[in-house]
Amino acid sequence: MSQVIIAIILLGLLALAFGALLGYAAEKFKVEGDPIIDQAEALLPQTQCGQCGYPGCRPYAEAIANGEKINKCPPGGTATMEKLAELMGVDPEPLTANAETQVKKVAFIREAECIGCTKCIQACPVDAILGTGKQMHTVITDYCTGCDLCVEPCPVDCIDMIPVAETLQNWSWQLNAIPVVNISEESKC
């Protein structure tokens, strides 16, 4: 057998042995995540907007698990804060001042001024902006969370945040907050 083939076989066996060793070590020393962090993250809206003061929903969920206030998520609103309060076993708190007084807004791109640089698309955490390079962009308002992250990267300043009027189609129905009386057959008579 030539020396090249022997070297290839030895390197293959060595790679196989190290791969098996790494696989075993990964299972043996696996770090389990905190389930509270995972549950808190699942409750957050996943907009990664940073309005809470953290770079994304996962870091904010970690901070909540370590005792941070649960009322810093404007896109999640009161419903998310109440679910977080229930999860953490704390009393619900009013949303922070800037979150509560803030009117829901969505991004609006003045398409005639858009140069198609795609910087807003890259900044949008929920993929609510459509467009391609050197073509105008537009916002899918149903997907826009109003996080405001697309405004700053725009080099021609053609993105505005406009307030959304509440209509029957976009109004937040709090169905779990409406009192419902269950009437049994016996109490009808």
UniProtKB/Swiss-Prot annotation:
<keyword id="KW-0813">Transport</keyword>
<protein>
    <recommendedName>
        <fullName>Ion-translocating oxidoreductase complex subunit B</fullName>
        <ecNumber>7.-.-.-</ecNumber>
    </recommendedName>
</protein>
<dbReference type="Pfam" id="PF14697">
    <property type="entry name" value="Fer4_21"/>
</dbReference>
<keyword id="KW-0249">Electron transport</keyword>
<feature type="binding site">
    <location>
        <position position="144"/>
    </location>
    <ligand>
        <name>[4Fe-4S] cluster 3</name>
    </ligand>
</feature>
<feature type="binding site">
    <location>
        <position position="73"/>
    </location>
    <ligand>
        <name>[4Fe-4S] cluster 1</name>
    </ligand>
</feature>
<dbReference type="InterPro" id="IPR016463">
    <property type="entry name" value="RnfB/RsxB_Proteobac"/>
</dbReference>
<feature type="binding site">
    <location>
        <position position="114"/>
    </location>
    <ligand>
        <name>[4Fe-4S] cluster 2</name>
    </ligand>
</feature>
<feature type="binding site">
    <location>
        <position position="124"/>
    </location>
    <ligand>
        <name>[4Fe-4S] cluster 3</name>
    </ligand>
</feature>
<dbReference type="InterPro" id="IPR007202">
    <property type="entry name" value="4Fe-4S_dom"/>
</dbReference>
<dbReference type="InterPro" id="IPR017900">
    <property type="entry name" value="4Fe4S_Fe_S_CS"/>
</dbReference>
<dbReference type="InterPro" id="IPR050294">
    <property type="entry name" value="RnfB_subfamily"/>
</dbReference>
<keyword id="KW-0479">Metal-binding</keyword>
<dbReference type="InterPro" id="IPR017896">
    <property type="entry name" value="4Fe4S_Fe-S-bd"/>
</dbReference>
<dbReference type="GO" id="GO:0022900">
    <property type="term" value="P:electron transport chain"/>
</dbReference>
<feature type="binding site">
    <location>
        <position position="120"/>
    </location>
    <ligand>
        <name>[4Fe-4S] cluster 2</name>
    </ligand>
</feature>
<feature type="domain" description="4Fe-4S ferredoxin-type 2">
    <location>
        <begin position="135"/>
        <end position="164"/>
    </location>
</feature>
<feature type="binding site">
    <location>
        <position position="52"/>
    </location>
    <ligand>
        <name>[4Fe-4S] cluster 1</name>
    </ligand>
</feature>
<feature type="binding site">
    <location>
        <position position="57"/>
    </location>
    <ligand>
        <name>[4Fe-4S] cluster 1</name>
    </ligand>
</feature>
<feature type="binding site">
    <location>
        <position position="154"/>
    </location>
    <ligand>
        <name>[4Fe-4S] cluster 2</name>
    </ligand>
</feature>
<feature type="domain" description="4Fe-4S ferredoxin-type 1">
    <location>
        <begin position="105"/>
        <end position="134"/>
    </location>
</feature>
<comment type="function">
    <text>Part of a membrane-bound complex that couples electron transfer with translocation of ions across the membrane.</text>
</comment>
<feature type="region of interest" description="Hydrophobic">
    <location>
        <begin position="1"/>
        <end position="26"/>
    </location>
</feature>
<keyword id="KW-1278">Translocase</keyword>
<keyword id="KW-0677">Repeat</keyword>
<dbReference type="Pfam" id="PF04060">
    <property type="entry name" value="FeS"/>
</dbReference>
<dbReference type="InterPro" id="IPR010207">
    <property type="entry name" value="Elect_transpt_cplx_RnfB/RsxB"/>
</dbReference>
<feature type="binding site">
    <location>
        <position position="150"/>
    </location>
    <ligand>
        <name>[4Fe-4S] cluster 3</name>
    </ligand>
</feature>
<keyword id="KW-0997">Cell inner membrane</keyword>
<dbReference type="GO" id="GO:0046872">
    <property type="term" value="F:metal ion binding"/>
</dbReference>
<feature type="binding site">
    <location>
        <position position="49"/>
    </location>
    <ligand>
        <name>[4Fe-4S] cluster 1</name>
    </ligand>
</feature>
<feature type="domain" description="4Fe-4S">
    <location>
        <begin position="32"/>
        <end position="90"/>
    </location>
</feature>
<feature type="binding site">
    <location>
        <position position="117"/>
    </location>
    <ligand>
        <name>[4Fe-4S] cluster 2</name>
    </ligand>
</feature>
<keyword id="KW-0004">4Fe-4S</keyword>
<dbReference type="GO" id="GO:0009055">
    <property type="term" value="F:electron transfer activity"/>
</dbReference>
<dbReference type="GO" id="GO:0005886">
    <property type="term" value="C:plasma membrane"/>
</dbReference>
<keyword id="KW-0472">Membrane</keyword>
<keyword id="KW-0408">Iron</keyword>
<keyword id="KW-1003">Cell membrane</keyword>
<dbReference type="GO" id="GO:0051539">
    <property type="term" value="F:4 iron, 4 sulfur cluster binding"/>
</dbReference>
<comment type="subunit">
    <text>The complex is composed of six subunits: RnfA, RnfB, RnfC, RnfD, RnfE and RnfG.</text>
</comment>
<keyword id="KW-0411">Iron-sulfur</keyword>
